[in-house]
A protein has these predicted regions:
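Short alpha-helix boundary/capping motifs
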Residues: 33, 150-151
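Polynucleotide-recognition surfaces of large bacterial nucleic-acid defense/processing enzymes
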Residues: 147
Length: 203
């Protein structure tokens, strides 16, 4: 495997390095199957075995992943994350429009015992808070800026699904269907000789 498989580096200095992780790549080894390729495996193979990931993103989520180059830097940055002194912003395209243009979703979530690796809203779970703002509306879809105030596994996806706005193409908490131009553009006409392809589809 060549270093070309490493995601693009968007920032680096003597203490940290930030990668633009693509959708479909784990950040760290999977608990169920540690052999699945992940970002830290690539970083350790091609850059340094001493780097640490400061946080994680879901496999299906693309975005910036920050890595510390030393243990003291990791401890310092981890403290900032734990103290909620780091602002995290996600952009989500949903199927369904929130009832309000902005708000805070407060729902307790916990692991789903019937579906290993997945989460669910449950009154006995841990309290989670997700703030959102509608950036733009597309008929029955919405583009949201999302700010998780807490950091539970799959929190954003579970919370958005809970208010009837699952993330497009989310097969775990939504219908898994892609987004088609015909769903957004009025009077859209598709060539009869060609099937319509999704603008955004499943991995």
């Amino acid at each position: 495997m060549s270093s070309a498989h490493l995601p693009p580096v968007v920032y680096e200095d003597d203490w940290i390095i930030a990668f633009n992780k693509p959708s479909g790549l784990l950040v760290a080894p999977d608990r169920w199957d540690p052999k699945i390729e992940n970002l830290m495996q690539l970083v350790h193979e091609h850059l340094s075995p001493d780097y640490f990931n400061v946080h994680r993103l879901d496999k299906e989520t693309s975005g910036l992943v920050l890595c510390a180059k030393t243990k003291p830097v990791l401890d310092s940055l981890s403290g900032l994350f734990q103290a909620a002194r780091v602002t995290k912003t996600y952009v989500a395209l949903t199927r369904g429009v929130p009832a309000e243009p902005s708000g805070v979703i407060i729902k307790r979530i916990a692991p789903d015992p019937r579906k290993p690796g997945l989460m669910k809203v449950w009154s006995g779970g841990k309290r989670c808070e997700t703030e959102y703002e509608v950036r733009e509306l597309f008929r029955r879809h919405a583009l949201l800026d999302v700010h998780p105030r807490t950091g539970r596994t799959h929190q954003i996806r579970v919370h958005l699904a809970a208010i009837g706005c699952p993330v497009i193409s989310d097969a775990f908490y939504g219908d898994g269907c892609g987004l088609f131009l015909s769903q957004l553009k009025r009077r859209y006409k598709q060539k009869k000789s060609e099937p319509e392809r999704p603008l955004i589809g499943r991995l």
